[in-house]
Curated annotation (Swiss-Prot):
Protein's name according to its UniProt entry: Small ribosomal subunit protein uS7
GO cellular component annotations of the record: small ribosomal subunit
Name of the gene this protein is made from: rpsG
Key words, A-Z: Ribonucleoprotein, Ribosomal protein, RNA-binding, rRNA-binding, tRNA-binding
Species of origin: Acetivibrio thermocellus (strain ATCC 27405 / DSM 1237 / JCM 9322 / NBRC 103400 / NCIMB 10682 / NRRL B-4536 / VPI 7372) (Clostridium thermocellum)
Subunit and interaction comment: Part of the 30S ribosomal subunit. Contacts proteins S9 and S11.
Domain of life: Bacteria
Length: 156
């Protein structure tokens, strides 16, 4: 929390090939140790694999996958009188997108395919078809929120 007013949000520059900010955010999520060129190769390689496997525009497939993985609700712990309740809250649009991108990359890394390009492509294609680890994570998050619906009145 800054002492002097709000800090302006820094905008991400769109990526060079697709000219899309969301793809740039995906590349930033893939990046490890500041090695952006490697992250770009992985991302664009995955998009080429998606084009080969589906025959569709990889950007459309990616956007569909992202929409399928974005959570609407999540739970936040709230302490009330010595007990901690998991209170369901709505997810802000920026956080929705950030969580979806993070989950896609995390669950792509856990897959068994040979290269990261193949893993990311497979995870994106699975997410488009409402399958895969990232989609399961979204479903689990929604189930947790649904199970704790009784504590919704503790929202702040």
């Amino acid at each position: 929390m800054p002492r002097k007013g709000n800090v302006p949000k820094r905008d991400v520059l769109p990526d060079p090939i697709y000219n899309d900010k969301v793809v740039a955010k995906l590349i930033n999520n893939i990046m490890i140790d500041g090695k952006k060129s490697i992250a770009q190769k992985i991302c664009y390689g995955a998009f080429d694999i998606i084009r080969e496997k589906t025959g569709k525009d990889p950007l459309e497939v990616f956007e569909q996958a992202l929409n399928n993985v974005m959570p609407v609700l999540e739970v936040k712990p709230r302490r009330v009188g010595g007990a901690t309740y998991q209170v369901p809250v709505e997810v802000r649009p920026e956080r929705r997108q950030a969580l979806a991108l993070r989950w896609l990359v995390v669950y792509a890394r856990e897959r068994s395919e040979r290269t990261m390009k193949e893993r990311l492509a497979a995870e994106i294609i699975d997410a488009t078809n409402n399958m895969g680890g990232a989609y399961k994570k979204k479903e689990d998050t929604h189930k947790m929120a649904e199970a704790n619906k009784a504590f919704a009145h503790y929202r702040w």
